[in-house]
């Protein structure tokens, strides 16, 4: 089998895995294209709303924040003996390359659920406060906003979180969450508790469950703490997290005809992603750090 045929077969395998993969990150994060080495998000929280125009326009002065996401490089690559590929005709390596395609599509899940969420209690948001904190300043209004709790997941703590999100304000003191598309983000260990809270139509005694379907359950295996839980409002253009993409090369090959192949008789295949993930609007996320 010639090199071009092998490459086409592996490319097909890659996109079979990529297209079939299901992701969770896009439920809670906004994908933003990047055109430079880094992108500035100092405008978060200060997007002006429409007002009645009485004479001249009145440009809103935005709060000055410093929040920048620098792009990083990520890759996944394999080394294959050229002779093995020709003998195998991609049968053995097809599943491996499909797995790389799956990994390429789902990698932002690891960034969002494996890093941003659990570290939100110690990582800073655009306002210089911890992303999950008890005293986020609301612009220059003099008031503060808390999106952090410490109570275990139950009906009471869930409703504290839900009310907090619905009452969240932007820098101008106006509601951020004018609608609610709530997602309860949990580790696998809290699945039974979450299902009892949100998916049981009736309580154990037979009374109606007032929290029935008040939020969708999102279970992430990347969350390793067994007690912490999160409530996200996924409504709106700007979500609590940002996935920034500068460049994506789905499938690259270094094979027959290259100097590396001439010396070692080995082919190299891989995928490349340049980007990053960071924090968006903390007003749309609530985190419970349970002792």
Question: Would you name each region that the model predicts?
Answer:
Residues 1-38, 244-250, 254-257:
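N-terminal catalytic cores of peptidoglycan-degrading enzymes
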Residues 2-4, 134-174, 178-183, 189-291:
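Sequence/fold signature of self-assembling virion shell proteins
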Residues 16-74:
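Assembly/oligomerization interface modules of large self-assembling protein complexes
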Residues 19-26, 33-36, 105, 112, ...:
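Residue-level signal for secondary-structure boundary elements
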Residues 20, 26, 60, 67-69, ...:
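Peripheral peptide segments
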Residues 46, 66, 81-85, 105, ...:
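An acidic- and aromatic-residue-enriched active-site/binding cleft used to recognize and process polar
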Residues 51-103:
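Long, hydrophobic/aromatic-enriched structural stretches that serve as scaffold segments
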Residues 88-91, 95, 102-164:
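Alpha-helical scaffold segments that mediate packing/assembly in large oligomeric complexes
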């Amino acid at each position: 089998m010639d090199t071009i045929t092998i490459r086409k077969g592996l490319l097909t395998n890659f996109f079979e895995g990529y297209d079939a993969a299901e992701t969770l990150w896009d439920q809670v994060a906004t994908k933003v294209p990047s055109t430079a080495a880094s992108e500035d998000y100092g405008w978060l929280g200060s997007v002006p709303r429409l007002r009645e125009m009485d004479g001249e326009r009145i440009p809103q002065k935005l709060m000055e924040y410093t929040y920048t996401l620098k792009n990083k490089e990520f890759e996944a690559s394999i080394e294959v003996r050229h002779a093995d590929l020709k003998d195998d005709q991609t049968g053995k390596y097809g599943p491996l390359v499909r797995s790389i395609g799956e990994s390429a599509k789902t990698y932002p899940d690891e960034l969002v659920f494996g890093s941003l969420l659990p570290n939100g209690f110690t990582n800073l948001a655009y306002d210089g406060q911890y992303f999950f904190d008890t005293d986020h300043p609301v612009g220059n209004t003099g008031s503060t906003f808390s999106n952090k709790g410490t109570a275990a997941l139950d009906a009471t703590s869930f409703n504290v979180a839900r009310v907090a999100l619905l009452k969240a304000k932007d820098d101008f003191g106006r509601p951020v969450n004018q609608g609610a598309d709530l997602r309860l983000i949990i580790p696998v260990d809290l699945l039974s508790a979450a299902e009892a809270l949100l998916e049981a139509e009736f309580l154990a005694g037979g009374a109606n469950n007032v929290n029935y379907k008040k939020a969708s359950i999102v279970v992430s295996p990347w969350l390793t703490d067994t007690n912490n839980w999160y409530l996200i409002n996924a409504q709106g253009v700007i979500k609590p997290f940002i996935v920034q993409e500068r460049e994506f090369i789905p499938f690259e090959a270094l094979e027959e005809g290259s100097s590396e192949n001439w010396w070692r008789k080995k082919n190299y295949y891989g995928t490349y992603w340049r980007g990053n993930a960071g924090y968006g609007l903390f007003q749309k996320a609530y985190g419970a750090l349970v002792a």
